[in-house]
Amino acid sequence: MILRLARRALSFGTCRKLTQYEATARRILALEPDHRELPAGVLRDRVAELRQRVRAGIALDEIKEEVFALTREASRRALNQHPVPAQIIGALALHDGHIAEMKTGEGKTLTATLVCALHALTGQGVHVATPNDYLAERDAGWMRPVYDLLGLSTGVITPEMDDDSRRESYRCDITYGIASEFGFDYLRDNMKFSAAETVQRGHAFALVDEADATLIDEAAMPLALFGPLGDHSSLYQAIDAVIASLQPRHYEIDPRRRVALTEAGYSEVEQRLQQQGLLRAPTTLHDIASISLLHHVVQSLRAHVLLARDRDYVVANGSVTLVDGLTGRPMPGRRYDEGLHQALEAKEGCAIGEETHTLAAITFQTYFRRYARLAGMTGTAKADAEEYNDIYGLDVISIPTHRPMIRVDESVLHASAAGKVRAILRELEDASARGQPVLIGAPSIERSEALAAMLEANGWRQRDDETKSKGTTRTFAVLNAKHHSREAQIIAGAGAPGAVTIATAMAGRGTDIRLGGEHADAARRAQVIAAGGLLVIGTTHHDHGRMDEQLRGRAGRQGDPGRSVFHASLEDEFLTNAAISVTRPEQAATIASSVASRLIRAAQKRHEIYSFDRRLGLLRFDTIIQRQRDHVYDLRRSIRDGSDTLTLATRLRNETIDDLIARFATPSAPWDIAGLDHAIRSVLTLAVDISPPFADPKADAKALARRVRATADRWIDGKIASMGETVFVDILGRLMMALIDHLWSAQSERLDHLKRRIGDRRLPAHKAVAEFQLEAFALFERMIADFRRDVTAYAMRVGILPT
């Protein structure tokens, strides 16, 4: 009851906001005559004047209507198109820090210009995060003429850019880039040794395009910077040979997709490792001495059992490239850590890359929550409204479409996989006979290629340049991670009369499939409309209903006709993996639609709840890690930016001395004079007189601390006098930053291991988080103590070599 009331209140609040936005949009439209005849120079001067008013303290809300109207006029002049009321409403929702749910084809790219131009006036920079570099470069180039007319600068961030180019792009008013690159630049900036080397200039406002991909699907994926550990290729190859020979009885997979050796598996692996000289009896894999070897065995087992070629990764040109499991896009440059990627390379017979360790890492969840204001756009958001609100504090506003949606959506659940295949072929043949273009959705690369093989077996040919030039009929194209370089070309032809395209979820994300083809004339477009528009065929339902909606959304854009139909079967993985119990009909070829809808929604709901709980759990862990990361980065930044390094070093040195004395000179026991003397000599490189009265257990430990501190202070003063304060502080600051980087890298790996260990304990969620927080804090205290001691030791030893 309470939940229903809360949802009703939320729905009422959304309706009220939409009413307000519609009224504001009407006022913005009414300003059009005032701006239509303005000379370009006056348009730019108006924006410059508004920028000055913002810097003087005026709120953006007070000028948003005029800025939106000016940007709308700039769009008309630069692109010969201007934002319609639905796009203005979407931009108003974005300005208020919401997720704007705008259906596919409603013009999110143009909508973004309104809110980006407004927030650019703060002078703090606007970041537009896209799912891939193609969209970043396309959108920046496409919208640049609009921003130019307003006197606003536009930059773009791509993976191959050097620091100077990145810095220049970040200095622009509006910066487009891949979401991951913004996160990587944040991590890299926090490892720079001077403020002048950093590239970003703050986190004021971020607009996340395709927000569901970045803020939901990839939210918990760590963005990590790696450093080399060394070459262990022969070890990976040897262990791979052992694991490749295992039988299913040697391992087991639990419901959470974790794999472990059985007792028979341990015996088999140990025997083979002994034969290869990698393990010596009586030592077993359970012994502490075998921890590293066991780690490599487990990673190889994961590579062989859990990761599948053409689903999780592809192999091309002798290298392994990971694939985004949700979009089907290749992720060049992304690598598994902790030896898993090397295990994959050994499995596939590729050249084994150098093993790496994590230098720094952050998740999208944590990174984007750093922005003072965050907003997002996507075609499918309502299903994840709770998650957007719980994790990011963002409400979802569904924006009405500019034109009515006339697409027809259907779903058929077949009793058998064979019946499903026959139905798909019938749909395809009928559409082909009408000249209707067809987009067939596949959940993975492997399934897309299986569909291609099925079509070829039924007389179809895969389209290439030769078949295209000959005008061969009954052809199809395949778009997946293996053919991503031809994505633009394939999408351009996907709406042509009779075109058939098999695609993974990467198809057309951020692009329109135009009826008739990319450069179609009115006659070809009319031909496709007469045939029914684009037909989308889903070959199974996805684990998440949102992914189904994204596929359906390829058809029926901007009021175009279209149809989508999902053909699934009781044998499909999305049903069997959800453990949905279904009674198979004895004779019926399909399941009644009411029953089918219930089954499909129940299966998807189970997957969605599991995924949400997993991401929420990871966020709770990551929030604890983030507190430590913030403390470390704040400390490092204060050293880098020249805050009083000497004062900090003195405080750390005094705390180190206090730690040593507390360890060896406890009030409740006789003092360990020999141990204290050794520790002082080891850490401080000093010989301090601790003879009586300080050798007396009843003596004042504070007086002893004062003597040690005074001796250390004189030693440091002597170094400063001989080296010069500027040189000493510069060397000491760099040493301190290098120490922070080293210790934080090790701490990050310890926290990752701790997360996994606690996960293996299978505790209730609240207990797991509580244990992680307790143990993580103990690890952090130890890291800070190590930092104090190491800084002190280096400071006491630092000097300039004679030339």
Swiss-Prot record:
Q: Which InterPro entries match?
A: Helicase_ATP-bd, P-loop_NTPase, SecA, SecA_DEAD, SecA_motor_DEAD, SecA_preprotein_X-link_dom, SecA_SF2_C, SecA_Wing/Scaffold
Q: Per UniProt, which keywords does this protein have?
A: ATP-binding, Cell inner membrane, Cell membrane, Cytoplasm, Membrane, Nucleotide-binding, Protein transport, Translocase, Translocation, Transport
Q: Where does ATP bind?
A: Q87, G105, E106, G107, K108, T109, D512
A Pfam family hit: SecA_PP_bind
**Matches recorded under PROSITE patterns:** SECA_MOTOR_DEAD
MF annotations from Gene Ontology: ATP binding; protein-exporting ATPase activity
Q: What top-level branch of life does the organism fall under?
A: Bacteria
> What reaction(s) does this enzyme catalyze?
ATP + H2O + cellular proteinSide 1 = ADP + phosphate + cellular proteinSide 2
Instruction: Keyword check for Membrane, yes or no.
Output: yes
Q: Which GO terms describe its biological process?
A: intracellular protein transmembrane transport; protein import; protein targeting; protein transport by the Sec complex
Recorded GO cellular component terms are: cell envelope Sec protein transport complex; cytosol; plasma membrane
Which EC numbers characterise this protein's activity in its record?
A: 7.4.2.8
Q: How does it sit in the membrane?
A: Peripheral membrane protein
* Similarity annotation: Belongs to the SecA family.
Q: How is the quaternary structure described?
A: Monomer and homodimer. Part of the essential Sec protein translocation apparatus which comprises SecA, SecYEG and auxiliary proteins SecDF-YajC and YidC.
Q: According to its UniProt entry, what is the function of this protein? A: Part of the Sec protein translocase complex. Interacts with the SecYEG preprotein conducting channel. Has a central role in coupling the hydrolysis of ATP to the transfer of proteins into and across the cell membrane, serving both as a receptor for the preprotein-SecB complex and as an ATP-driven molecular motor driving the stepwise translocation of polypeptide chains across the membrane.
Q: What is this protein called?
A: Protein translocase subunit SecA 2
